[in-house]
Design a protein with these regions (language model features):
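C-terminal, flexible cofactor-proximal segment of oxidoreductases
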Residues: 2-11, 15, 317, 323, ...
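Glycine-rich dinucleotide-binding loop and its adjacent helix/turn
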Residues: 6-21, 104, 169-232, 237, ...
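N-terminal Rossmann-like FAD-binding beta1-loop-alpha1 element of flavoenzymes
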Residues: 26-53, 222-232
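Short hydrophobic core segments
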Residues: 31, 54, 159-173, 216, ...
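Glycine-rich active-site loop/strand segments that organize a redox cofactor
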Residues: 59-110, 196, 200-202, 239-258, ...
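Feature captures the FAD/FMN-dependent oxidoreductase FAD-binding
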Residues: 94-164, 169-174, 279, 286-297, ...
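A Rossmann-like FAD-binding core segment of flavoenzymes
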Residues: 127, 131, 230-332, 397, ...
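Active-site substrate-recognition segment that forms the wall
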Residues: 212-249, 261, 356-380, 386-398
Length: 459
């Protein structure tokens, strides 16, 4: 009788394909044509590496275009990658005023669209990636795996082979749920919830005019939306947060290092104080259910509120399902790499102390696969655009075999990145503030001193 029933390791490995394909001759595939994905492409181009950018949307910065009406807090001088700038200037591009605060639409039209054009036909739109694997290998098979090219499948069935994959697809399409337990609130899937930044004073005005809208969340996206809603006449606005007070959301007013951000918090505070915006603190959403033509939202403590519309500004989470056949080493809490998690975990330290990091911290057991940008941070709300740019530079250097450069990570963010907006607290601890949309899109370098590792800003 045979002593094996299910195949042995030897027989399993003997089935591996012997492909004549030279993976090193294939391009590096970059998933996503947002700021970090295009920055990665610019660094790859600068190093003479073949690349192909696959963007699911119709244009560069497709996610940013969805909040094109929003003006950001950090000026142009913090929002442009160095390699991207060099490439653009070589094509005759004139940089915007470095002190100007751009809108999302301006970031796309003045920076990302010209950058995609400069990168040429190597940037493809309407190319949604649905799966990544190794050619001829599922996740279990090992022998010869590292020499096999990556296989990228698109939603139309097309398959592309690559020597490496840089996943900069972001998290915009996977927002966090309203439910306080990490699961959708009871009934949440049956009601309409807006998770983007609606243009309530423009294209979406009719949907909110004269209605009662509930905004859930305590970040800058929530604040921006609340201020816009408050400008609509005959409109009732309610704001629900989990915290016991809104101090973090208000910020430091006129003392803020970024005046536009400070003004945002001060205006929101005034609206709450005046009663124009009703604030519900300690509100942990448990149930969402239709109540006639309205929606009833119930907190864990039994409080409820009936509204016409809900805007969930609760942040985003990564979706790693497209890489389910790759060997990933994900932190069980954050969903970042296990090596990166201790550096960014908001439960452990102030996000202002996140150290520079690059290819080594972003690496998985699957050689040649890197997730960069906001997706690399998992659920940590501490990502900054400048961090993503340095990730792109480091990973491109690693793929070029220049490990000295890859490991010489020099992030120009001295003690920056507190993910709350409580400037008074930040100043007391001598740390800077991070701000932005969709996981800290924007960079805000501030010259500040060191904070102890025991501090916490983002819990």
């Amino acid at each position: 009788m045979s002593d094996a029933c299910c195949g042995t390791t030897t027989s399993l490995e003997s089935e591996q394909p012997r492909s004549p394909i030279d993976a090193e001759a294939l391009p590096v595939v970059v998933i996503g044509a947002g700021p970090v994905g295009l920055a990665a492409a610019a660094h790859l181009a600068e190093r003479g590496l073949d690349f192909l950018v696959l963007e699911a949307g119709e244009q560069a910065g497709a996610s940013i275009a969805q909040w094109g009406h929003v003006r950001v807090f950090s000026p142009w001088k913090y929002d442009i990658d160095a390699a991207a700038r060099r490439l653009l200037e070589a094509h005759g591009w004139t940089a915007p005023d470095p002190e100007w605060l751009p809108t999302g639409a301006e970031i796309v039209s003045h920076y990302l669209a010209p950058l995609a054009k400069a990168l040429g036909p190597n940037v493809r739109f309407r190319s949604k990636v649905t799966a990544i694997s190794r050619l001829g290998y599922d996740r279990v098979r090992t022998n010869g795996r590292d020499q096999a090219p990556f296989l990228i499948r698109l939603d139309d069935g097309e398959e592309i082979r690559a020597r490496a994959v840089i996943d900069a697809s972001g998290t915009w399409t996977t927002p966090n749920v309203l439910g306080a337990s990490g699961l959708p609130a009871r009934g949440e899937d049956e009601v309409e919830i807006e998770h983007a930044l609606p243009d309530v004073l423009g294209a979406d005005r009719e949907a909110y005019q004269g209605k009662h809208t509930l905004v859930v969340g305590a970040g800058h996206s929530a604040a921006t939306t609340l201020l816009a809603l408050a400008q609509l006449g005959d409109t009732e606005v309610t704001w629900a947060i989990r915290a016991g007070d809104a101090a973090r959301a208000y910020g430091g007013g006129g003392a803020d290092a970024l005046p536009a951000r400070g003004a945002l918090g001060a205006r929101l505070h005034a609206l709450v104080t005046s009663g124009r915006v009703r604030l519900l603190t300690g509100f942990f959403t448990h149930a969402v259910e239709k109540a006639g033509e309205r929606v009833r939202v119930t907190s864990l403590d039994g409080r409820d509120i009936s509204v016409d519309r809900i805007i969930g500004a609760t942040g985003f989470r990564p979706d790693h399902s497209i890489a389910s056949e790759l060997r990933l080493d994900l932190d069980p809490i954050l969903g970042s790499t296990r090596a990166l998690a201790p550096l960014i975990d908001p439960n452990q330290h102030s996000c202002g102390t996140v150290p520079p990091h690059g290819a080594d911290e972003l690496a998985h057991p699957e050689p040649g696969y890197y997730a960069i940008g906001v997706k690399s941070y998992g659920r940590a709300p501490t990502f900054l655009l400048a961090t993503g740019y340095e990730q792109a530079r480091s990973v491109a250097a690693a793929l070029a075999g220049d490990w000295e450069a890859a490991r010489d990570v020099q992030l120009d963010l001295p003690e920056t990145g507190v993910c709350s907006s409580n400037l008074a607290e930040a100043q007391e601890q001598r740390i800077g503030l991070a701000t932005g949309i969709s996981g800290g899109l924007l960079a805000t370098p501030l010259p500040l001193a060191t904070v102890s590792s025991g501090g916490s800003c983002c819990g």
